């Protein structure tokens, strides 16, 4: 069933959310984080919420959109297609944030349709803290017509970093709690198989959080998470619990006030799990 293109431009607004120290710390632990910026209150200025915690506090409009029957999306067949974050100002425990979202596009492809929307999140001072662009892929809404050719991602010969992350068995259950992503494909093996998946798959935003950690650990001075200004990923294939992921980073270009880096993420079979991923670092 095709998605309803008449919803393009439709807007949503979340209720205010107060950032919980307990939950922001829980979120950091849920993707194997070890950066004291998220844990050590003895630091000058205290702790910050992990930038990737925006997957929870900026997702209010997303939750509304998912249950909006007017769109025609079949959540049983939805996977995350791509994600972009721009972090503008630090978010700390105790802050109150509100998000507004707007549906921006619907793209019909052979094997499904892409639903895209953007969100803007502001704090209690009306300062914009995060901008985000989200895309879901509804596998039940394809055209059946072959897609045009896409450009292959250029693979560099030299890398700035090459590091690995072990996906824990049980990672999806741990990540589901603070992120709010309880989609059955992440926590119910039988359900995941019924909708054509090999079993439980890892939340795409958990894989993105791994990539963010790699960028902070290897591309910033003193592992400063506030130096990573943007991160974009497209999800290439499912990540499974127990897999070992390899992340590699390389320089793309020097911009006016920041540098753009590419990120490659591979599973233990050497297949890419993220595609066209990049970040900018101040």
Where are these regions (language model features)?
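HotDog/MaoC-like acyl-thioester-processing domains
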Residues: 1-7, 12, 78-164, 239-282
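Small/polar glycine-rich anion-binding or flexible loop at a beta-alpha turn
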Residues: 43-46, 227-240
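Hot-dog-fold acyl-thioester-processing enzymes
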Residues: 1-80, 143-148, 154-225
């Amino acid at each position: 069933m095709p998605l309803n293109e008449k919803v393009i431009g439709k807007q949503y607004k979340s209720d205010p959310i107060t950032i919980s120290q307990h939950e922001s710390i829980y979120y950091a632990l849920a993707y194997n984080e070890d950066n004291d910026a998220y844990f050590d209150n003895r630091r000058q200025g205290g702790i910050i919420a992990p930038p990737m915690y925006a997957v929870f506090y900026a997702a209010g409009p997303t939750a509304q959109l998912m249950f909006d029957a007017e769109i025609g999306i079949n959540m049983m067949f939805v996977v995350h297609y791509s994600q972009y974050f721009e972090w503008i100002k630090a978010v700390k425990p105790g802050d109150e944030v509100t998000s507004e979202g707007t549906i921006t596009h619907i793209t019909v492809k052979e094997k499904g349709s892409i639903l895209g929307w953007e969100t803007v999140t502001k704090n209690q001072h009306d300062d914009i803290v995060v901008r985000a662009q989200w895309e879901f892929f509804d596998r039940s809404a394809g055209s059946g017509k072959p897609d045009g050719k896409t450009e292959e991602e250029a693979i560099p010969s030299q890398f700035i970093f090459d590091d690995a992350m072990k996906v824990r068995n049980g990672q999806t259950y741990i990540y589901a709690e603070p992120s709010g992503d309880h989609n059955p494909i992440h926590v119910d093996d039988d359900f995941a198989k019924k909708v054509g998946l090999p079993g439980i798959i890892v939340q795409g935003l958990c894989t993105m959080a791994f990539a963010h950690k790699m960028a902070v650990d290897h591309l910033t001075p003193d592992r400063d998470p506030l130096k990573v200004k943007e991160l974009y990923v497209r999800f290439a294939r499912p990540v499974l619990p127990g897999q070992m992921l390899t992340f590699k980073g390389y320089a793309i270009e020097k911009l006016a006030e920041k540098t753009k880096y590419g990120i490659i993420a591979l599973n233990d079979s050497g297949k890419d799990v993220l595609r066209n991923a990049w970040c900018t670092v101040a």
